[in-house]
């Protein structure tokens, strides 16, 4: 299954509990004002990768991690690709998977293709970013209207309190990557 992605980052400490390998899906039509990742919105940008190859990169022996984070863009706007990735991660006994979404939980439950993804993730942070709402750092949410859902026994709500909120990583080409959740 092909997935359009924006970026892969390994060794992140500001995208969920522990050291995480992160993928940002490409494409989002939600257009939340003040979005932290506007560069991920264009559905024609980014690059195509198979779910198997993406899984290989996220679980690379050269990039050990405590968890996988899927962000965007909007991962649920590619529900078939997201489901293929989540199933492959589960099949390979990946560490806990956290997914970020701008959809509400009710919206995800209301769409069969999106709902099918939920059993294959360990935690979900969802809801549209609201630049006028204060952050809820105790549950790792950029705006207080967003919710954290624990979907398996592999993570707990307490795992999301006190996390680093942002980081700057210099990649192999010398580019600075700002990552994490919106602080302003």
Please provide the spans of the model-predicted regions.
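Short, charged low-complexity linear segments at domain edges
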Residues: 1-19
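Short gly/ser/thr-rich secondary-structure transition/capping motifs
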Residues: 5-6, 105-111
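Canonical Radical SAM [4Fe-4S] cluster-binding loop centered on the CxxxCxxC motif
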Residues: 13-50
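Core AdoMet radical
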Residues: 37-49, 63-78, 94-108, 118-132, ...
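Alpha-helical scaffolding segments of alpha/beta enzyme cores, especially the outer helices
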Residues: 53-56, 81-88, 116
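P-loop/Walker A phosphate-binding loop and immediately adjacent motor/lid segment at beta-alpha junctions
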Residues: 78-90, 134-179
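Accessory C-terminal segments flanking Radical SAM cores
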Residues: 182-184
